[in-house]
Design a protein with these regions (language model features):
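Extreme N-terminal basic, low-complexity initiation segments
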Residues: 1-14
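Extended beta-strand/beta-hairpin segments
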Residues: 36-108, 116-200
Length: 200
């Protein structure tokens, strides 16, 4: 008999109408590890791209996690041939303010992915972009039980164009958002409030 607390899914794996295509995670015990796999909806005519990173926690201050205040949240993220990213937790959770936290990295990935698609579409449209900056902001809410999730991310890109129609340049942000791999992978609102500047 199914657990009453387990969400119900249709045959296609969707949770209700318009819900995320994700099947209930299945845990397999492999050599002492618990591997949880989420089976998403299948897209037609796709190619897989794989991304591998390593993470090393270097915050053992001598007694490990013997107490909540007895260890550092610092870590390093690495990948072959790339400089390490020095990370920690948000300072609100006893992290190091000078290091990147996971929440900032998520916001940054949305900003960067949108920018890459925007430049691609601008080049295709014959619009010459000479500068692009963004001030992206994310809002996360945390419940009393400590469980948190992102509520929204707003991008504020300022795009400088040398030629082309400024209004056309502005409208390219919509398809850039629709094509952004990261935006398509999150379940919260990602908004864009662009500014277009025409170079002198």
């Amino acid at each position: 008999m199914p657990d009453r607390d387990m969400p119900s899914f249709g045959e296609d794996g969707a949770r209700g109408q318009g819900g995320p295509l994700a099947r209930w995670p299945q845990a397999n015990h492999v050599r002492g590890r618990t591997v949880v796999r989420f089976h998403g909806g299948v897209m037609a005519n796709t190619r897989e791209h794989r991304y591998a990173v390593s993470l090393i926690w270097n915050g053992n201050l001598g007694t490990g996690t013997s107490g909540y205040r007895d260890y550092s949240r610092d870590y390093e993220i690495g990948a072959d041939g790339k400089a390490a990213i020095h990370g920690s937790a948000d300072p609100a959770f006893r992290g190091d303010r000078s290091r990147w936290n996971p929440e900032e990295l998520l916001v940054a990935s949305l900003s960067a992915c949108h920018k890459l698609w925007y430049l691609h579409l601008a080049a295709e449209a014959g619009i010459t972009v000479t500068a692009y900056t963004d001030r992206a902001e994310g809002v996360m809410e945390v419940g009393r039980d400590g469980v948190g999730r992102f509520k929204s991310v707003v991008l504020h890109p300022t795009v400088t164009v040398a030629n082309g129609d400024p209004e056309r340049a502005r409208t390219l942000h919509k398809p850039a958002h629709e094509k952004c791999f990261i935006a398509n992978s999150v379940n919260f609102a990602v908004e864009c409030e662009p500014e277009i500047v025409v170079a002198d």
